[in-house]
């Protein structure tokens, strides 16, 4: 790992993967830093294999690197490609998580980017209001790395926060965030799972005796969804409450989540036909976090924008999920799933530019949005689209010797379109 790069991408999840690929393909010397030992972020670390946001109510929308990734997975027989189905099924495609690690790192390396695993960013280099690099901790010590542009794809907005960016956190009245989840991969399933909206309520009803007997905690709904390998499914049900940026809370979630997972699978064995011989093959090594910091940018995407299928002159990515999906922040609350059918909406480039800071972009879950808009835009395919835009912008800024904020948005959009991004 060298001491100077054109572009440093922090975080190897969906947004970071796309950022690094796009930046490197456009000629920037690009370093991708990931604090764990593989790429994929929420999709692999937290085991959320449902890549959501490929299409809106009117049909296929998202192309570019997100589509390229899915097609690479399909070629290897490692994805359930739902694009041919009707909405909402068409917006989800399920992937094999182990294969996803291999495919994503192959795409990043073939693009020409460098990956450094097990690298934790602990500080930011700044001159006045300009981010000039990062400080990273590895098993070999601490290193300062300069960069013309840093892209924060950490999900939690960690780098932007270290740089002093303004951000919103949780809901306005009390700062609480949506519950996080321990995902569970299981094998030995003989029940055919095809429709979460039908399968979930059926399984939940069968588990009522287990809830009544306190064999498991109360669940409003048990989501069991298929995986590409025969007999495998993943369960997205356990909910853990608190702040994901509280170190002890986030640590406790791991053992609490594993305890919930084992109790739940035992109940499935006992009460649900088709799950009699189901067993845990893996639980997430990271909790699936839905909400934390939203870095305030030059524009804040709004609920009205999302629901009205807004178009912007600097729209560089699509939000395709036709719903505002707000999970419970407390156990006694009800989730909100507010559907709308107006069509996909633009995510403006200004939402990726932290207000008052130069030398830095954000992409993914930490975008600039109000809470309802964020609850739609946070999906992983949307995050990849933002990542491709941010990586492309960073490389253009380097080649033009400009700050990201100084780029011509129309030129950026033309470049994305030339890269098969449907805008």
Positions of PLM-derived features:
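Beta1/beta-strand and adjacent pyrophosphate-binding region of the FAD-binding site
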Residues: 2-13
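Membrane-embedded transmembrane-helix bundle of lipid-linked glycan/lipid transferases
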Residues: 8-10, 19, 24, 129
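N-terminal Rossmann-fold NAD(P) dinucleotide-binding loop
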Residues: 16
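Conserved N-terminal/central alpha/beta ligand/cofactor-binding core
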Residues: 22, 28-29, 34-127, 178, ...
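Flavin (FAD/FMN)-binding glycine-rich loop and adjacent Rossmann-like elements that form
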Residues: 42, 137-138, 142-149, 153-423
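Short, hydrophobic/aromatic-rich segments at coil-to-beta transitions
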Residues: 128-134
């Amino acid at each position: 790992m060298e001491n100077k790069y054109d572009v440093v991408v922090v975080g190897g999840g969906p947004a970071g993967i796309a950022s690094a690929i796009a930046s490197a393909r456009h000629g920037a010397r690009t370093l991708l830093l990931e604090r764990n030992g593989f790429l994929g972020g929420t999709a692999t670390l937290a085991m959320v294999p449902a890549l959501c946001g490929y299409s809106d109510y009117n049909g296929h929308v998202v192309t570019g690197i997100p589509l390229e990734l899915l097609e690479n997975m399909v070629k290897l027989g490692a994805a359930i490609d739902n694009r041919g189905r009707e909405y909402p099924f068409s917006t989800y495609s399920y992937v094999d998580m182990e294969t996803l690690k291999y495919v994503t790192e192959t795409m990043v390396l073939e693009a020409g980017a460098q990956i450094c695993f097990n690298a934790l960013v602990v500080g930011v280099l700044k001159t006045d209001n300009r981010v000039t690099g990062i400080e990273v901790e590895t098993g070999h010590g601490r290193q300062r790395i300069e960069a013309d542009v840093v892209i924060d794809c950490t999900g939690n907005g960690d780098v932007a926060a270290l740089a002093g960016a303004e951000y919103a956190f949780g809901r306005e009245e009390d700062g609480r965030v949506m519950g996080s989840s321990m995902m569970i991969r299981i094998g030995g399933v003989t029940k055919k799972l095809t429709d979460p909206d039908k399968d979930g309520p059926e399984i939940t009803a069968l588990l009522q005796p287990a809830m009544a007997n306190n064999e498991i905690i109360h669940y409003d709904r048990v989501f069991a969804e298929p995986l590409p390998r025969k007999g495998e499914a993943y369960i997205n049900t356990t909910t853990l409450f608190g702040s994901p940026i509280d170190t002890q809370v986030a640590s406790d979630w791991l053992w609490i989540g594993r305890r919930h997972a084992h109790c739940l699978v035992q109940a499935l064995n006992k009460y649900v036909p088709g799950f009699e011989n189901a067993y845990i093959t893996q639980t997430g090594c990271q909790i699936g976090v839905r909400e934390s910091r939203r870095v305030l940018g030059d524009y804040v995407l709004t609920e009205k924008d999302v629901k009205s299928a807004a178009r912007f002159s600097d729209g560089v990515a699509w939000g395709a999920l036709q719903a505002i999906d707000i999970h419970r922040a407390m156990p006694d609350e009800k989730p909100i799933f507010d559907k709308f059918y107006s069509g996909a909406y633009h995510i403006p480039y200004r939402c990726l530019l932290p207000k008052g800071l130069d030398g830095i972009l954000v992409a993914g879950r930490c975008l600039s949005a109000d809470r309802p808009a964020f609850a739609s835009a946070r999906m992983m395919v949307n995050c990849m689209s933002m990542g491709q835009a941010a990586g492309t912008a960073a490389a253009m800024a380097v080649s033009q010797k400009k700050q990201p904020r100084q780029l011509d948005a129309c030129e950026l959009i033309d470049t994305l379109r030339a890269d098969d991004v449907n805008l």
